[in-house]
Structures are given as structure tokens and as C-alpha cells.
Amino acid sequence: MKRTLALILLALGMHVQAATLTLNDAREQGRVGETLSGYIAPITHDAETLALVSRINAARTESYQKLADSNNLPVDEVAKMAGQKLVARAQPGEYVKGINGKWLKK
């Protein structure tokens, strides 16, 4: 009984993990796009996409802050430099937000 329960819980855990939306999946599905601010923004506003955007942007904020601190720069400047690179590196078919605030498909 315990073994069966453990196997069921393991299978459920793998299913949840496999179903978790990744940044690459969201980009490919047109659910998120890169912005010049250095952060991703949602294109679709479902709960799964919004949770991903929050997680990714929190991690980026932490990373930008560390870079800013080590280089004695404002965090906004670091984020904008990263944003320019991320927008430029977006793959064909992915969305980026232009300086006019509109989504463009590369």
C-alpha cells in the first residue's frame, strides 16, 4: 500500500513538473515577449503565463541588481542594456515590444 501510494505521488509530481510552462515554451507559443526594459511581459493573461512572468522577472531583477552592485551602475541601466540585447536576440516568430509599445513578431 505504501509503495503504491509512493508511486502515485511520484507520478503526479512528474506530471506537474512536465506540465510546468517554461520560458522557451511561452515564447514559442506567443504567450510572452521580450521588452526593452529587460523584463518579459505577458501577451496572454492566463494564470500560468502570469505566474511564469512573475518568476522570470523576479529572477532577472535579482540578477540585474547583482550586476549593478558589482559595476556601480543603476539597476535600471543594467536592465535596459539587457533588454536591448534580449530583444535583438529574439528568434524569428517570437514577440518583442517595440519602442512604440506595440508587440512585433520577429
Where are these regions (language model features)?
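Classic N-terminal secretory signal peptides
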Residues: 1-18
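Anionic, Ser/Thr-rich low-complexity intrinsically disordered regions
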Residues: 19-106
